[in-house]
UniProtKB/Swiss-Prot annotation:
Pfam family, one: FlgH
Physiological role: Assembles around the rod to form the L-ring and probably protects the motor/basal body from shearing forces during rotation.
Keywords: Bacterial flagellum, Cell outer membrane, Lipoprotein, Membrane, Palmitate, Signal
Membrane topology, from the record: Lipid-anchor
Gene Ontology MF terms: cytoskeletal motor activity
Subunit-level organization: The basal body constitutes a major portion of the flagellar organelle and consists of four rings (L,P,S, and M) mounted on a central rod.
One biological process term in Gene Ontology: bacterial-type flagellum-dependent cell motility
Protein localization: Cell outer membrane; Bacterial flagellum basal body
Family matches, as HAMAP family: FlgH
Family: Belongs to the FlgH family.
Sites of S-diacylglycerol cysteine lipidation: 24
Protein known as: Flagellar L-ring protein
CC terms in the record's Gene Ontology section: bacterial-type flagellum basal body, distal rod, L ring; cell outer membrane
Length: 238
């Protein structure tokens, strides 16, 4: 019986330490741009010509280029170069001052008035006063500022063509440096009219933009806080 009890104690202690170690580990990063980051153009079977002057149009004209039109990507699988020009800054400040003053004065008769002549007391000597003064002051100030700058180039692929002609694009760039890999992921919706003749479009002209820049090196793991540490930080009184 003693051995069985000792075995259970060791089992529970081992499980407890495993949970503690896992809780102190870093939390897995959830990608901002999820899913496959490329698109392949589907195989389109061309319509068979029947000799008529009015031919049925192929759903997507891959390789077709109008005579008087600049070449612009507009089909699934086409590539577009995005010029990253993100420069965002924000600031916020607040202050508050609270003051509260309170004062109370209470007079109490020590002895009955009929005993004043016997004790030789006048009316004023037969009273005692209780004064209470309270004051509460609070002053608080806070400020917050953030500035993010992201510049560069990334070539993305047209993933889908929306019914109104806008292009849903997605792309990823990976750069291996020493023992870590840098990931740049991008997704958004492009209006084909914003694509210039060099097949470039600014990131500021793209809707529903998702830009992610992460790495899987050791420094990135060190900067993450485990869920147990975050829980203890929330309930800590200091």
């Amino acid at each position: 019986m003693v051995k069985l009890f000792s075995y259970k104690i060791k089992y529970y202690l081992t499980a407890f330490f495993i949970i503690i170690i896992q809780s102190c580990a870093s939390v897995e990063h959830k990608p901002l741009v999820d899913g496959i980051t490329t698109a392949i153009a589907p195989n389109i079977i061309p319509k068979i010509k029947n000799g008529s002057l009015f031919q049925e149009k192929t759903p997507i004209n891959y390789g077709y280029q109008p005579l008087f039109e600049d070449h612009r990507s507009h089909n699934i699988g086409d590539t577009i170069t995005v010029v990253l020009q993100e420069n965002i800054s924000a600031s916020n400040s607040s202050s508050s001052n609270l003051t509260r003053d309170g004062k109370a004065n209470v007079g109490v008769t020590v002895t009955p008035g009929t005993l004043n002549p016997i004790l030789g007391l006048n009316v004023n000597d037969n009273k005692t006063g209780i004064d209470s003064i309270g004051k509460n002051d609070f002053s608080g100030k806070g400020s917050n500022s953030a500035k993010n700058t992201f510049t560069g180039l990334i070539t993305v692929t047209v993933k889908n063509v929306l019914p109104n002609g806008n292009l849903k694009v997605i792309g990823e760039k990976q750069v291996a440096i020493n023992q870590g890999t840098e990931f740049i992921r991008f997704s958004g919706v492009i209006n084909p009219n914003n694509i210039n003749k060099n097949n470039l479009v600014a990131s500021t002209q793209i809707a529903d933009t998702r830009i992610e820049y992460v790495s899987n090196n050791r420094i990135n793991d060190i900067q993450k806080m485990g869920w147990l540490q975050r829980f203890l930080l929330k309930i800590s009184p200091i």
